[in-house]
UniProtKB/Swiss-Prot annotation:
Keywords: 4Fe-4S, Amino-acid biosynthesis, Cysteine biosynthesis, Heme, Iron, Iron-sulfur, Metal-binding, NADP, Oxidoreductase. Siroheme binds at residue 482. Binds 1 siroheme per subunit. Binds 1 [4Fe-4S] cluster per subunit. Component of the sulfite reductase complex that catalyzes the 6-electron reduction of sulfite to sulfide. This is one of several activities required for the biosynthesis of L-cysteine from sulfate. GO terms for cellular component: sulfite reductase complex (NADPH). One of its GO terms (molecular function) is NADP binding. PANTHER family: SULFITE REDUCTASE [NADPH] SUBUNIT BETA, SULFITE REDUCTASE [NADPH] SUBUNIT BETA-RELATED. InterPro entries: CysI, NiRdtase/SiRdtase_haem-b_fer, Nit/Sulf_reduc_fer-like_dom_sf, NO2/SO3_Rdtase_4Fe4S_dom, NO2/SO3_Rdtase_4Fe4S_prot, NO2/SO3_Rdtase_4Fe4S_sf, NO2/SO3_Rdtase_FeS/sirohaem_BS. GO terms for biological process: cysteine biosynthetic process; hydrogen sulfide biosynthetic process; sulfate assimilation. This is Sulfite reductase [NADPH] hemoprotein beta-component. It catalyses: hydrogen sulfide + 3 NADP(+) + 3 H2O = sulfite + 3 NADPH + 4 H(+). Its cofactor is siroheme; [4Fe-4S] cluster.
Length: 569
């Protein structure tokens, strides 16, 4: 790692730097901890290190008080996030995932997430190794889906443009593989891989890995379903005559912040320019290595790429990337994002295959009373001759359905509540992170609050005679922002039980950050405020003017232009 550079932050390193450095390339004492059946937890440094293996230690917060009363430790378990570049799963993989969730997890569900992958929640220590081995048997792992590394690489779920999508997906996979940790720790611990007397080497990530998490996407305009401005590194596909010719590169987006700390803020990604397809991996590596060396290892709250760009300057960072990669950025090519939502229902691809996008509220695949979604997905997997594609909007695409299978897939989907003809536009445009009871960071409800909140919002829209319209509405249980509220027209950020900060003024395309309108208010007050504003929008909007554009034009809220300067102003 470079240490004599003027852009390196000097000072006492954060403790995470110590634990990564002492971890023996992410091994720690995880293997020994696994054998300790006196606690369901991973202790000491291992609590953090398991994240690099794709897991977070959690407990059921609904049960904490009762278990404490019984003198029991919290119900410790792990959440696993799988590595699925571009979110593609084969039917036989789905069936293995379904079986494990049903038999070996506390909640029995498959949770599709905003990172275009799935999560198992509530896996107890005795089942953790089995979980990794089960996934490995069907060609899936969870390496580097958490921790200070490049996380799961997202790719636009666009089955219409089959040729470009296929190329973009292949690049998402190549980027993911190229930036993966090279340590053998994962295979040794979880897959009983042979322990070789070799010296691990991390040529890209370095022995201390990255200063903080790093997120990458491949986006295919006009769809911004991956929300590029929530990510550190974005490759915007530029195609000519149906062929991918290169990417515009956007660097330094991110939504996380800390309540009360104005040195933290959401930030849109900066456009570095255009590159040819063949330069993709060189640029990806150079951006990562520059952030590795220049990122803040002293203060983790200011360690992400977005803060590095603010501190060193966009042009300095860009010049360093060009120097390290040997690639000069060209002028950005023209593109436009027009929407972010998934096309719910059937569409036909240019290859003649059919694709069915299923709306999964909150991404939670479970058998509900009268709506056995999980069973339905498994039944489809048994007969499906294509693949499944998870979307960054937490929905599921049954992709590549043959003509002869189409009617059967639809029949199964309808019989299990996976197709709802009366689904409102508002429900399709609403999203929440997991939050309570499993997320240890959640300050307020998100997933469990969203369905009722959307029903109330639907009522407000109907009251003002605009039931057919919708607003990008997102709820996140804490300011880390997994629900991507900071790119919504209406964004709620959890502040405490039943309390949220209400942000307004994002846009439908995901290219504007919303500003705080009211702080720390309850659910009823939120709806009261929205009732008034939506009423004004219904009466005074210009033709086809979105809610986010309306509240800015009419001065309800100021536009965030440069979040480093005006997000809190």
């Amino acid at each position: 790692m470079t240490t004599d550079n003027k852009f390196v932050v000097e000072g006492k390193l954060a403790d995470n730097e110590r634990l990564k450095g002492e971890s023996n390339f992410l091994r720690g004492t995880i293997a020994e901890d696994l054998k300790d059946d006196l606690t369901g937890a991973f202790v000491g440094d291992n609590f953090q290190l398991i994240r690099f293996h794709g897991m977070y230690q959690q407990d059921d917060r609904d049960l904490r008080a009762e278990r404490a009363k019984q003198k029991l430790e919290p119900l410790q378990n792990v959440m696993l996030r799988a590595r699925l570049p571009g979110g593609i799963i084969k039917p036989q993989q789905w069936l293995a995932i379904d079986k494990f969730a049903e038999e070996k997890s506390l909640y029995g569900s498959i949770r599709l997430t905003t990172r275009q992958t799935f999560q198992f929640h509530g896996v107890l220590k005795p089942n953790i190794k089995l979980m990794h081995q089960t996934l490995n048997q069907v060609g899936i792992d969870s390496i580097a889906t958490a921790g200070d590394v490049n996380r799961n690489v997202l790719c636009t779920s666009n089955p219409i443009e089959s040729a470009v999508h296929q190329e973009a997906y292949e690049w998402a996979t190549k980027i993911s593989e190229h930036l993966l940790p090279k340590t053998r720790a994962y295979a040794e611990i979880w897959l009983d891989g042979e322990k070789k007397e070799t010296t691990d080497h991390e040529p890209i990530l370095g022995a201390n890995y990255l200063p903080r998490k790093f997120k990458t996407t491949v986006a295919i305009p006009p769809l911004n379903d991956v929300d590029v401005h929530a990510n550190d590194l974005n490759f915007i596909a530029i195609s000519k005559d149906g062929k991918l010719v290169g990417f515009n590169v956007l660097v330094g987006g991110g939504l996380a912040m800390t309540h009360g700390d104005h040195a933290t803020f959401p930030r849109k990604a900066s456009d570095f320019g255009f590159i040819k397809v063949e330069d993709t991996l060189a640029i990806a590596e150079a951006v990562v290595s520059t952030q590795r060396d220049w990122g803040n290892r002293v203060n983790r709250k200011n360690a992400k790429t977005k803060y590095t760009l603010e501190r060193v300057g966009v042009e300095n960072f860009k010049a360093e990337v060009e120097k390290r990669s040997g690639v000069t950025f060209g002028e950005s090519q023209a593109y436009e994002f027009t929407e972010r939502g998934d096309r719910i229902g059937w569409v036909e691809g240019i290859d003649g295959k059919h694709h069915l996008t299923l709306f999964i509220e909150n991404g939670r695949i479970l058998d509900y009373p009268g709506k056995p979604l999980k069973t339905g997905c498994a039944e489809i997997a048994k007969i499906h001759d294509g693949d499944f594609r998870l979307t960054a909007n937490q929905n599921l695409i049954v992709a590549g359905v043959s003509e002869q299978n189409k009617a059967k897939v639809e029949e199964i989907a309808r019989a299990h509540g996976l197709i709802e003809d009366d689904l409102s536009a508002q429900r399709k445009d609403s999203m929440a992170c997991v939050a309570l009871p499993t997320c240890p960071l959640a300050m307020a409800e998100a997933e469990r609050y969203l369905p009722e909140a959307v029903t109330q919002l639907e009522g407000i829209l109907a009251k003002h005679a605009i039931a057919q319209k919708s607003i990008i509405y997102r709820v996140t249980g804490c300011p880390n922002g997994c629900g991507r509220s900071m790119l919504a027209e209406i964004g709620l950020v959890g502040k405490g039980p039943g309390k949220y900060n209400l942000h307004l003024g994002g846009n439908r395309q995901g290219t504007r950050i919303p500003k705080m309108y009211k702080e720390n208010i309850g659910e009823q007050q939120i709806m009261d405020e929205l009732d008034v504003l939506i009423g004004q929008w219904a009466k005074e909007a210009q033709s086809d003017e979105s809610f986010g554009d309306f509240v800015i034009r009419t001065g309800v809220i100021a536009e965030v232009v440069n979040s480093a300067e005006d997000f809190y102003a």
